[in-house]
């Protein structure tokens, strides 16, 4: 009987060791981020620049980003109820001081070209990892053909915005133009702006605004962003008013 009990103890210990080992293995599992991007956005109209971060993963407890020199640029950690849920997607944009305050050359020196490492820990202990290639290939701002602020009133049912093509920066192809038409200051806290946001192919130089989107006798801002292959983008913006 005693020998039988000892055998059971040995079996139980072996099973416990196996379970602990399996749990440790699961907790050290390495999982790639679903999305990990870092890009520059230049505002050619206002004369400023900033960096944007995008990432996506299963729920995480913390994430961090380091630059090509190994310096940590960002760390985000969940706390309280958020820690119980975990984080998933994250979008963050740096401040955008004007070029009078921080010239473009100084801005680029703060964020060197190269590989930026993304790391994190998941809710179940898994290790998230990813890499974003960051370049200084910055496109010019699109030349806006029209309509322009102070110009003729725009028919809200037949509105077309136009821009000129942008040359590839340092040979990096333009892959798309993002076009936004924005009604600001709606007065609704849950919907402060109403935005038409369309991604156009690199061959496009105009967009017809869908009838029914624009209100009459209303001021709108519109932007066009030229996006190069690495993700960097430069925008130009203007305003127009619709006819009564």
Residue map of PLM features:
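Short, compositionally biased P/S/T/A/G/V-rich stretches that sit at domain boundaries
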Residues: 27-43, 132-166
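Long, polar/Ser/Thr-enriched low-complexity segments
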Residues: 27-102
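Solvent-exposed loop/turn segments flanking beta-strands in beta-repeat/beta-sandwich domains
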Residues: 54-74, 167-192, 218-219
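Extracellular Ig-like/FN3 beta-sandwich strand-entry sites
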Residues: 111-115, 217-219
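Conserved structural position at the C-terminal beta-strand
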Residues: 120-122, 226
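Extracellular fibronectin type III
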Residues: 128, 227-244
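Short S/T/G- and acidic-enriched coil/turn segments that sit immediately N-terminal to beta-strands
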Residues: 196-197, 202-210
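Beta-strand-rich modules
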Residues: 212-232
């Amino acid at each position: 009987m005693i020998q039988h009990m000892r055998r059971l103890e040995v079996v139980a210990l072996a099973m416990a060791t196996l379970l602990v080992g399996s749990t440790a293995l699961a907790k050290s599992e390495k999982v790639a981020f679903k999305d990990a991007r870092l890009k520059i956005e230049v505002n050619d109209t206002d004369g400023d620049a900033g960096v944007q971060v995008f990432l996506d993963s299963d729920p995480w407890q913390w994430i961090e980003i380091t630059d090509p020199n190994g310096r940590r640029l960002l760390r985000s950690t969940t706390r309280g109820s958020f820690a119980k849920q975990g984080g998933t997607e994250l979008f963050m944009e740096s401040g955008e001081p004007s070029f009078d305050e921080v010239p473009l050359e100084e801005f680029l020196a703060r964020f060197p070209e190269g590989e930026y490492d993304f790391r994190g820990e998941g809710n179940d202990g898994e290790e998230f990892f990813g890499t974003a290639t960051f370049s200084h290939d910055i496109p010019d701002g699109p030349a806006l053909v029209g309509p322009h602020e102070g110009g003729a009133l725009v028919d809200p049912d037949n509105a077309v915005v136009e821009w000129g093509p942008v040359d590839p920066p340092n040979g990096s192809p333009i892959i798309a133009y993002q076009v936004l038409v924005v009604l600001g200051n709606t007065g609704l806290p849950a919907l402060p702006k109403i935005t038409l946001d369309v991604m156009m192919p690199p061959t496009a130089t105009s967009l017809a605004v869908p009838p029914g989107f624009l209100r009459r006798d209303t001021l709108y801002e519109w932007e066009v962003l030229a996006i190069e292959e690495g993700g960097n983008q430069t925008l130009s913006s203007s305003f127009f008013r619709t006819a009564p």
